[in-house]
Amino acid sequence: AESPSSKTGANTGDVAQSNLTTPKRSVDKMTSPTDHALTRDSLYGITPEPTYGGMLSFMRRRYTRELSNVDVAVMGIPFDLATTARPGTRFGPRSVREASACLAWEEKVMGWGFNPLDDLAVVDYGDCFFDSGDPANAPQAIYECARDILATDTTLLSLGGDHFVSYPLLRAHAEKYGELALIHFDAHSDTWAEECERIDHGTMFYHAAQQGLVSPAHSAQIGLRTHNDQDHGFHIFDAPAVHDLQPADLAAQVKKIVG
């Protein structure tokens, strides 16, 4: 009798093994269409990846904390414990990375005619860690994260986070570069005078000016729509002034202030 294993036919569901064989395909992990945050072999240029999939990093840059020969490190600061109103900016770094995936495939940036990623070695450094259950130590943790990156002579691009994170970042930058010129886009001045140094997203630029981290005479605050009796020496372009000025004229004035 014929053994069951030797039968072929529509009723048995058995098909010759040769018909089941799928040709093997070699996939080079460095040219795979996804997860360039982990697999890209160059710090320069772009490599198209589906905007809807793959591991997210800023502009699909490589995830790494190795900063040798790196021009720019992008670091997230998921902190919003200083806000006095609606929280949620702790999700900012993740959201910016997700949005950046929609721009990471363009060979040339509209209006520029070139792509800065062709000339700059940019990496995603990941997020600065701090214990959310110990908020008093968060400013020091943010400062140390920034300090360690700057110590390698790498430029730091930070993703917040509420406004307060600017203060420990300014501390780290001023320690390395000296007094800074600040260009600040906001609806509020964040220079409310308060002598105690509590964690607050409305006082950090007051403290930065008082401590010599920034030079108000070489700093501009742009788009303010709330009143503050004291400007503390900052150059202010309020919202009506910004609406009246052409963007190129505003940029020229800010450049002159910064020097």
Regions inferred by a protein language model and the residue ranges of each:
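Extreme N-terminal basic, low-complexity initiation segments
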Residues: E2-T12
